[in-house]
Amino acid sequence: MTITLTPRNLLRNAELYANEPALSVKAGKAPDGSWEWDTKTWKQFSDEVVSVSKSLISMGFEKGDRMSIYAYNRPEWYSCYGATQMTNGVGVGVYHTCSPEEVEWVIGDSGSKVVIIGDNPQSGGDPEKTPSRRFAKILENLPDVECVVILDGVEPIDHEMAISWTDFLEMGKEVKDSEVHSRIDGIEPDDLAALIYTSGTTGNPKGVMLTHDNWDAELSEVDRIITLNQGENYVSWLPLAHVFGQLVDNHLWCRSAIHMHVVDNALHVVDYAKKVQP
């Protein structure tokens, strides 16, 4: 069976739309009140995903290994998730608002080897509600975790397994591009691509297994409903731990090569929509 892989779509975009905008975050306001943006082109974003993939390969991240991302939407969320797809690993989204007990369950149940720690813009300024504080409380209960990556601007965790984003990217400097491409070439349609955890209304959340073929089938159905053209604006606000967030913001985004604008807080989505005009 032939399917369209998201990693191949990303590499295609890096070639066809190298200097076109892929992802933007608000950088501030100009003197006239207009918004200023920090933007990555498709080539820049693709290069970052390849760099993350190399770091994963350097630390022994194998086919089927899991990476949990405990953060709200931000550029590194997309590049880390993209790297799990590129290395034939498995992406596991963890809601940025999850309690320590909920985080422990999802990361432990998934058997995640790598954990990415970001921020929670809905913490209300309470440091105890930040992912780094919450994760630090349960790290010792997660024997499968081998590496904890602290994203820029996030409170560090004092633990031997915790490293900065910069140091993490340095890990893969000696890995060749060919090793990454070899991983992509080895992906089969029924290889596991993601674990999406349910809400856990009647018990502990359960990880729904989605393969590369599942994503391709979902994208084909979306194509029947809506057509998105290269370069059109899109606003990302739904948490990426949500299945629809992953479908559109990680997979459809690359397939259609649209220009994604990432909100800094889900509560600000209306303001972003007014400015971006998606």
What positions do the PLM features span?
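A short helix-loop-beta submotif of the ANL/AMP-binding
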Residues: L23, R66, Y72-P100, W105-V114, ...
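Structural core segment of the AMP-binding/adenylate-forming
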Residues: L10, M86-E170
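Conserved pre-ATP/AMP-binding loop-to-beta segment of ANL
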Residues: N19-P21, I150, A162-T166, K173-Y197, ...
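Conserved AMP-binding/adenylate-forming core of the ANL superfamily
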Residues: L23-G82, S99-E104, S164-K173, L210-H212
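Conserved S/T- and glycine-rich ATP-binding loop of Class I adenylate-forming
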Residues: M67, T84, V115, L192, ...
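A short N-terminal helical cap/helix-turn-helix that marks the beginning
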Residues: T2-G28, D47
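Conserved AMP-binding A3 loop
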Residues: T39-K43, A193-L219
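Conserved AMP-binding/adenylation subdomain of ANL enzymes
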Residues: N88, D216-N233, L240-P278
